[in-house]
């Protein structure tokens, strides 16, 4: 299984982080460009690969945490006083949405390497000394999905999934 995972992850090398979307608190990172057209004729980028994150994660450089998963629950304006009506679900109202957009628009970062660990974690190294670390933090042995990498390059999508019970591919 390790060889299969390494082969899949090696296909990410050289792809840029091009887009991010969100479904609730699940971040969806897009690498490369793969265009699809919906039933209304609108064209959009699904990425050659999409990484759906359902575990804690963070982007770092050598000096700081650039953005982390829990920034979703912080207001976009870091200097404003707490707003009891703050709605993290509103797009771009939270710090995570704003900082991820800034990371993508102000940097062209491409993948240099990607590795998994025995606990379901994932580390992706980008150029410019930027790193994405996904670190599952559940001790539960119940079926919990940590992250999913989806390959959109072909008609049939392939998935690499990290679960509390191990890795799965199709």
What are the language-model segments listed below?
Residues 1-170:
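Surface-exposed, interaction-prone regions used to assemble/regulate multi-protein complexes
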């Amino acid at each position: 299984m390790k060889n299969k995972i390494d082969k899949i992850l090696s296909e990410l090398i050289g792809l840029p982080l091009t887009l991010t979307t969100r479904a609730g608190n699940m971040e969806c990172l897009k690498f490369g460009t793969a265009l699809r057209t919906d039933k209304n004729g609108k064209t959009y980028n699904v990425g050659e690969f999409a990484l759906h994150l359902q575990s804690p994660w963070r982007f770092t450089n050598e000096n700081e945490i650039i953005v982390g998963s829990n920034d979703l629950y912080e207001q976009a304006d870091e200097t404003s006083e707490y707003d009891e009506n703050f709605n993290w679900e509103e797009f771009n109202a939270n710090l995570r949405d704003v900082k991820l957009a800034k990371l993508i628009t102000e940097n062209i970062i491409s993948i240099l390497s990607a590795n998994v660990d025995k606990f379901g974690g994932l580390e992706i190294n980008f150029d410019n000394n930027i790193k994405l670390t996904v670190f599952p933090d559940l001790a539960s042995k119940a079926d919990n999905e940590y992250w999913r990498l989806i390959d959109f390059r072909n008609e049939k999508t392939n998935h690499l999934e990290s679960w509390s019970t191990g890795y799965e591919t199709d």
